[in-house]
A protein has these predicted regions:
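Often metal-dependent polyanion-binding catalytic scaffolds in large enzymes
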Residues: 3-183, 199-203, 209-215
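Extended, regular secondary-structure scaffolds
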Residues: 218-287
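Structured alpha-helical segments in the cores of large, soluble enzyme domains
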Residues: 164, 186-207, 229-249
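Conserved small/polar residues in nucleotide/adenosyl-binding loops
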Residues: 1-5, 284-289
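Short, Φ-rich (hydrophobic/aromatic) sequence segments
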Residues: 123-126, 194, 277-282
């Protein structure tokens, strides 16, 4: 008698939620290769998704749409997020947030004073965006390029200060070479921050951010910025070609971020100024596939 009462009280989502908690829901196991249904955060996302799906089919959608979906005439996407006022994808305006500051979790984030810090802030923005939507997002490396020169000037001041400390002065060409070498190390560090943060961050929906990185030289506002952007792109391609080590210590190509590289007159033809960037793009693409 008591069991019969429980059955009558059972919610329409009970069986599916219990099956995913016990890890015996085959639909969930096959649903999304980017989510591991054995992980607690993923299970919580799926539990919320079942509630949303139930509300969507019982209360929010017209009956004919629900029936057409069940019969396979159409497919209604993302019913597991439909109940919330949540959007899908974003083109992230990194430029505005980096240049003018932003707020993350109630904390004021001011304009960064180095390229590596700008990259770190960018990954925090990416994580926040990914945790408050259910689709992908895109950023442009052009928005990070101005901070290369910020770091250049900062490094120059540091080198000059070191000269004064030891009582010597480098010739201008030597000074410039030291600055550029240190700058390249900073660019490597910043790009690596984005690469590793993106693939290791776990957002509130239990997965790494679906990030696309846009690489377009002619978005740069001037020639100095364009050359700095080229350095960022070159390092991004180098690290993507190298890959990351998996749990077995084997180098693999990460699924994210996706890279989009734009071809124009100054990089498409052999012998053009930035063709040296275009060649490794093809190698990176072949290795990824």
């Amino acid at each position: 008698m008591y069991k019969r009462q429980l059955v009558r009280k059972a919610n329409t989502t009970d069986n599916r939620i219990l099956s995913l908690i016990e890890y015996n829901n085959e639909d969930v196991k096959q649903e999304n290769s980017n989510k591991n249904p054995a992980v607690n955060s993923v299970q919580r996302d799926y539990m919320a998704g079942e509630v949303s799906r139930d509300l969507t089919t019982r209360m929010l959608l017209p009956h004919d749409i629900v029936e057409a979906d069940r019969e396979g005439i159409i497919h209604f996407h993302d019913s597991d997020y439909y109940a919330q006022h949540m959007h899908n994808c974003d083109l992230v305006n990194l430029e505005d947030m980096l240049q003018n500051g932003t707020v993350i979790s109630g904390t004021m984030i001011e304009k960064p004073h180095s390229f590596s810090t700008a990259c770190n802030i960018a990954t925090q923005i990416i994580a926040q965006v990914a945790s408050n939507q259910y689709g992908g997002q895109s950023i442009s490396l052009t928005h990070l390029a101005p901070f290369v020169d910020v770091s250049r000037e900062k490094i120059r001041k540091e080198v000059i200060s070191e000269q004064e400390l030891v009582g010597m002065e480098y010739p201008e060409d030597v000074l410039n070479e030291i600055v550029e070498r240190r700058l390249k190390k900073e660019i490597t560090k910043g790009v690596q921050t984005i690469e590793y943060q993106v693939i290791t961050l776990m957002t509130t929906n239990g997965q790494a951010p679906f990030l696309t990185v846009f690489m377009y030289l002619n978005e740069a506002k001037n020639e100095r910025e364009k050359k700095d952007l080229a350095m960022i792109i070159e390092e991004t391609l180098r690290q993507r070609y190298q890959g990351v080590k998996n749990e077995a210590g084997v180098w693999v190509t990460p699924a994210f971020p996706k890279l989009i590289y734009v071809l124009e007159e100054d990089n498409i033809e052999e012998g053009s100024e930035y063709y040296y960037l275009t060649e490794p793009v093809s190698y990176t693409h072949l290795r990824a596939h």
